[in-house]
Amino acid sequence: MFPGAVIRKLAFSEEIYARYQAFTSFTAHVRGPVDIDAMSEAFDALLQAHPVFAAHLEEGPDGNHHIVANDLLHSGLVVIDGRRAENPHVQLDQRDSLFRLQLTLGESENLVTAYVHHSLADAHHLGSLLDELLSRYTDVVTTGDPGPITPEPAPQPAEDLLKRRGIKQSALTGFERFLPLLFAYDLPPIAEEMRKFEAPEPVPVTRCRLTSQETADLVSFSRDNGLSFNAVLAAAILLAEWRLRETPHVPIPYCYAVDLRFLLSPPVGATESTNPVGLATYLAEIGPDTDITELAADIVATFRADLSDGMIHQSALRSGRILEGTPPGLPPFILCTNVSTLPPIRTPEDVELVDFHSRIHCAMDVPFGFYACSIATDRLSIELHGSIPAPQLLLDAIRDILCSVPSEYGLFME
């Protein structure tokens, strides 16, 4: 059936990403010289340590995809001169490769971009791979050797992982709290069916960054008020969306991804599973007098209750329908990740990590917004992915709320 050796069939939670040919990319902005040969050697070592990423996907007769080993060597590092006026987008093809690495050379910064198929890795997984790549690169530059290589098995599907942890699917999903909204309001029609493309295209993204001081102030505000940083950020996003939607009487459905690795016992390694991610839900009923601390506290309380009930753990067993946007009859969803903090990454002494961002690539149009939040180099970054109107207006409103909160609540930093 397949010309190469089949590693395994994709699980249900992974298949949705194959059908949309979805890749996620992380880009590290580095200042300082980059040795191309050393980066290429580090990438080769990374693929030897994680050989599944040297494979590709093939569609079976039933329409489902399989991970199939490649008979040929991986194409390796792609080097682009970013000083040229135009550069073509990297060609992503799941039938050829599940991991591409691109080095873009610039005047003041160089960009190291890792593209990984979403069927095999979520953001946490990809971040770990990029960290390992740069660590091995540092070893090659400083010692001439990329370090020990112990090949890892293919990561487990979330379904298998959760089954081994005793997690079972229940009848409840968390979306029940949105049912009172179903066809309850006069809402504009949802966009027509999403356009499909032959090959993955980069999804539009708009971004804002707080300064390191603004980020530190916000962290202090959250801690001093007994709130999680994630909840404060979620409350700011909800308040900004509520103000700009101009439908003050309509509650807002909020959905956010939850990394289950540290919520399971025993904890799950960064590269042990493909997408061990649950989905938490919250129904925001906001008015002119809604206080950000009260809203954030209610988000935390709802999350803890759903976590205690096992709702969030078992949500990873369900379909990726949320990737297709808001169902008919409901107000537009807000989709968001929890904040991920990039740990210090090893680099040679003359190389400095100065920025970090992500991008989604898939073979369909994304006519809804998806927030991705992270802290790197001590600065909060908020990305808004999707083909939506006025994304910068939303991000500016969120930033204004986040930057004004510490002073409004009495936290002044010198």
From Swiss-Prot:
Quote the protein name from its UniProt record: Phthiocerol/phthiodiolone dimycocerosyl transferase
Q: What is its EC number?
A: 2.3.1.282
**Keyword Acyltransferase applies:** yes
Q: Which residues are the active-site ones?
A: 118
Keyword Lipid metabolism belongs to the record: yes
* Subunit text: Monomer. Interacts directly with the acyl carrier protein (ACP) domain of the mycocerosic acid synthase (mas) protein.
Task: Tell me the GO molecular function terms.
Answer: acyltransferase activity
Q: Provide the alphabetized UniProt keywords.
A: Acyltransferase, Lipid biosynthesis, Lipid metabolism, Transferase
InterPro entries linked: CAT-like_dom_sf, PapA_C
Q: Indicate the annotated site residue(s) for Structural role in the organization of the active site.
A: 122
Similarity comment: Belongs to the acyltransferase PapA5 family.
* GO BP term, pick one: lipid metabolic process
Q: What class of enzyme is it?
A: transferase
Pfam assignment, any one: PapA_C
Q: What does this protein do?
A: Catalyzes diesterification of phthiocerol, phthiodiolone, and phenolphthiocerol with mycocerosic acids, the final step in the phthiocerol, phthiodiolone and phenolphthiocerol dimycocerosate esters (PDIM) synthesis. Can directly transfer the mycocerosate bound to the mycocerosic acid synthase (mas) onto the substrate alcohols.
Q: What is known of its domains?
A: Consists of two structural domains that are related to each other.
* Species annotation: Mycobacterium ulcerans (strain Agy99)
Where along the sequence does the record put site: Important for mas ACP domain recognition? 304
Reaction catalyzed? 2 a mycocerosyl-[mycocerosic acid synthase] + a phthiocerol = a dimycocerosyl phthiocerol + 2 holo-[mycocerosic acid synthase]; 2 a mycocerosyl-[mycocerosic acid synthase] + a phthiodiolone = a dimycocerosyl phthiodiolone + 2 holo-[mycocerosic acid synthase]; 2 a mycocerosyl-[mycocerosic acid synthase] + a phenolphthiocerol = a dimycocerosyl phenolphthiocerol + 2 holo-[mycocerosic acid synthase]
